[in-house]
Amino acid sequence: RLVNAGVRGASSVADSSRMQVMIHLDQGGRYFYLKEWFDGALRAGLMDFDLIGLSYYPFWHGTYTDLKETMERLVEEYRRPIMIVESAYAWRKCEKGFIDEAQERIAGFPASPQGQRRVLELVNGITASLPERMGMGVFYWEPLCQPREDSGGWDANMGLLDENGQVMEGIHAFSFTREGFDPSAWAKVYEPQSLTVHTGTPAALP
C-alpha cells in the first residue's frame, strides 16, 4: 500500500504521460532476494512499474558474475529495463576511509584511481551487455564527495574528486557507449576455489 500510495502521489503532481515509475532495491547481485521482493509485492497488489533500479557495490552485493546473472534473470522474469542507480568504488585506502583491505579483496580491484575506473567500466559493460538493450545505464553515488580535513566515511575516498578537488580518471568510465562496448576487454572474473595452505610454506595459487 505504501509503494502504491507513493506512485499515486507522484502521479498527481507530475505529467503522467511522461513520468516513469522505477522500483529501486539494493542487493544488485542477489537474484533470489530481488525475486522474492518483486514476487511478493506483485502478489500483494503492487501497481504497474516501468523500470527496475538496483544498487550495486562490489564489496557488498556479490560478484560481477552475480550482477550479470541477476540482471539477465530479472529482465527475463519481469520484462522491464534495468538501471544501476547506485554504484561506487574507492580511489584510495585511508585510515578514515570507507574501504578496508577485506572489502578491497572482495571487490577484486585495488582501491586506486585506476581500480576505481576499472570497476566502473566493468559495471557499465555488464549493464550494456543485457539482451534487447534492456540495460539503461549506471549512476554513480556520490561523484562530488571530496575529502575534507578530519572528514571520514564516504567522503574520504568514494567520490570522483581527489583531495584537491580535481576530477580523477574514473570519470572516463562514463564516456562509455553501447556501440563502443568490447566484451573482450572485460576483466576475467574467477569464482571462489578451495585452497589448502600450510604455515611456512608458500601457497600454490590456482
PLM feature spans:
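Aromatic-rich peripheral "rim/lid" segments of glycoside hydrolase catalytic domains that contact
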Residues: E69, R73-E76, R92-L122, I126-P206
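Glycoside hydrolase catalytic-domain groove-lining segments
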Residues: N4-I23, F32-E104, G115, E121-G135
